C-alpha cells in the first residue's frame, strides 16, 4: 500500500526522476522562471526550497551539499552569490506556482514556477 508515501513517481525510474529534479532545479536557479507541468512544478518546489535555505549561509560545506544535489557549477555559484543573499530575511516560501492553462498536445495542466523576488 502507498499510504503516507510522499512524492510523485511520474512513471520514471529513480535515477531518471533524480535527473529530472536536478535539471529542473538548475534551470529554475539559472532562469528564475520555468514552464513545466503542474505536478512537476509542485515537486520541484519541494526540491529547490531547501537548497535556497541552505544558500542563505555561505560555507564550503553548504556549497558541496548544493553541488551534490544540483551537479551544476554555475547554478551553485548563482545560488550562493545571488539568491542566498536576496532571500536572507525571508523565512521560506521562495517560489511561486502560476497555473497557465493546458498543453495543446495532450491537455496536461501547465504552470510557471518562479522565484518570488525575481529581477
UniProtKB/Swiss-Prot annotation:
Gene3D superfamilies listed in its UniProt record: Ribosomal protein L17
InterPro entries: Ribosomal_bL17, Ribosomal_bL17_CS, Ribosomal_bL17_sf
Pfam families, sorted: Ribosomal_L17
GO MF annotation terms: structural constituent of ribosome
Family the entry assigns: Belongs to the bacterial ribosomal protein bL17 family.
NCBIfam families in UniProt: L17
Gene Ontology BP terms: translation
Tagged with keyword Iron-sulfur: no
Assembly description: Part of the 50S ribosomal subunit. Contacts protein L32.
Keyword Ribonucleoprotein on entry: yes
Organism (species): Methylococcus capsulatus (strain ATCC 33009 / NCIMB 11132 / Bath)
Gene (UniProt): rplQ
A GO-annotated cellular component: cytosolic large ribosomal subunit
UniProt entry keywords in alphabetical sequence: Ribonucleoprotein, Ribosomal protein
Domain of life: Bacteria
Full protein name: Large ribosomal subunit protein bL17
